[in-house]
Amino acid sequence: MNPANHSQVAGFVLLGLSQVWELRFVFFTVFSAVYFMTVVGNLLIVVIVTSDPHLHTTMYFLLGNLSFLDFCYSSITAPRMLVDLLSGNPTISFGGCLTQLFFFHFIGGIKIFLLTVMAYDRYIAISQPLHYTLIMNQTVCALLMAASWVGGFIHSIVQIALTIQLPFCGPDKLDNFYCDVPQLIKLACTDTFVLELLMVSNNGLVTLMCFLVLLGSYTALLVMLRSHSREGRSKALSTCASHIAVVTLIFVPCIYVYTRPFRTFPMDKAVSVLYTIVTPMLNPAIYTLRNKEVIMAMKKLWRRKKDPIGPLEHRPLH
């Protein structure tokens, strides 16, 4: 097909999860609850980490940032998906599609780099506990966080730069509930073989490099923990287990989607729902379920909300 003979499409039709109204209503009900829990769970962690002085440490600073990013990440796709499920008219403009694509990869890239920073933080905390506060000081922490944001921005800009030059002259039906590279690139009315290689290389490089760093960090930690006491080993494994669970939930779907040729497989939409909608909801529960410090901070916040003036004996007499 010669793109010169066809006009550029004004937008795309998102095919979504289903065309059947009854199924769309069920999906709307379920994912509304999931998104509500995502917002409440992640923002609650941000509030707790910010308000409790005992949690003003590097580990909880990074956790608070991850929760904020999970809230943003889910908000890029979930609200629009919910509206489209009810409206039955899931169209998105070309500019809106590129905007969603940019922020999706921007926040997603930051999360990938941040998880790598969190693994490094745990490695230093366990391998060099006496020097931990010197190595992971506020300046280093801020620089690593800034590097994660810059890395996410560069990664996203590459995606946009490679996509925006493509001619889209029809068809305009995008087989997903949000705009992403694998589905979008298949609608281009030109040969995209070289472009697919570039995008797979870019996504694969970011994902696999970070995953290998994480794998190396935790392999070294597991070897190191053999020499620790039972109590120290148990506490370290508890912290690492939470992080490994989150890493698995994020990296495995990303590797499945972005490090292979852009072809459609039956599991694609289910995997997309997992890492864009479900995983951001699970992360707060995974990190707080066995974390005594966060649970204590939650209880303090709840008591403060119930009794904002303070205990009866400390109230002023009038």
From Swiss-Prot:
Pfam families: 7tm_4
UniProtKB keywords: Cell membrane, Disulfide bond, G-protein coupled receptor, Glycoprotein, Membrane, Olfaction, Receptor, Sensory transduction, Transducer, Transmembrane, Transmembrane helix
GO annotation, cellular component aspect: plasma membrane
SUPFAM superfamilies xref list: Family A G protein-coupled receptor-like
Disulfide bonds: C97-C189
Entry membrane topology: Multi-pass membrane protein
Subcellular location: Cell membrane
Coiled coil residues, start to end: none
Topology feature Extracellular, residues: 1-25, 80-100, 159-195, 259-269
Residues with attached carbohydrate: N5
GO molecular function: G protein-coupled receptor activity; olfactory receptor activity
InterPro entries: GPCR_Rhodpsn, GPCR_Rhodpsn_7TM, Olfact_rcpt, Olfactory_Receptors
Family assignment from sequence similarity: Belongs to the G-protein coupled receptor 1 family.
Function text: Odorant receptor.
Name of the featured protein: Olfactory receptor 4D5
Natural source organism: Homo sapiens
Lineage: Eukaryota, Metazoa, Chordata, Craniata, Vertebrata
